[in-house]
Amino acid sequence: YIDAETMTLHHDKHHATYVANANAALEKHPEIGEDLEALLADVEQIPADIRQALINNGGGHLNHALFWELLSPEKQEPTAEVAAAINEAFGSFEAFQEAFTAAATTRFGSGWAWLVVNDEGKLEVVSTANQDTPISDGKKPILAL
């Protein structure tokens, strides 16, 4: 359970600020386009004067956007395909839950726990600090907390 006050703060303040700051950085270099996922997949292509701003704020936007997309008022079970991939990667859904919980609860300071598809097409649990996104490490996030 996450209370309404926390969700409002994250949506109306944090996420809105990440969007505004990412847009301000992108305005300085319109030639690079606005595809944050592509830019953050190869951060070296981002001009040095806005690189950290896009890593922080673009990452914050992408992370929160996925988080909002995944929220549901009702408990949802994974699809059969995802459940099979979880069982293959972790041995059981319970083992996945333990790994995901550990990633979320052992992160010092702010950050995220992720279920990602790695470059080998396999599921893994990772944690990132602050607003870093696993996209920058070549991973595709499918669950975020």
UniProtKB/Swiss-Prot annotation:
High-level lineage: Bacteria, Bacillati, Bacillota, Bacilli, Lactobacillales
Positions with a binding annotation for Mn(2+): 10, 64
Keyword hit for Iron: yes
Coiled-coil region(s): none
CC cofactor: Mn(2+); Fe(3+)
Cofactor note: Binds 1 Mn(2+) or Fe(3+) ion per subunit.
Cellular compartments per GO CC: cytoplasm
Protein purpose: Destroys superoxide anion radicals which are normally produced within the cells and which are toxic to biological systems. Catalyzes the dismutation of superoxide anion radicals into O2 and H2O2 by successive reduction and oxidation of the transition metal ion at the active site.
InterPro entries referenced in this protein's UniProt entry, alphabetically: Mn/Fe_SOD (IPR001189), Mn/Fe_SOD_C (IPR019832), Mn/Fe_SOD_N (IPR019831), Mn/Fe_SOD_N_sf (IPR036324), SOD_C_sf (IPR036314)
Annotated EC: 1.15.1.1
Chain sites annotated for binding Fe(3+): 10, 64
UniProt keyword annotations, A-Z: Iron, Manganese, Metal-binding, Oxidoreductase
Protein name from the UniProt record: Superoxide dismutase [Mn/Fe]
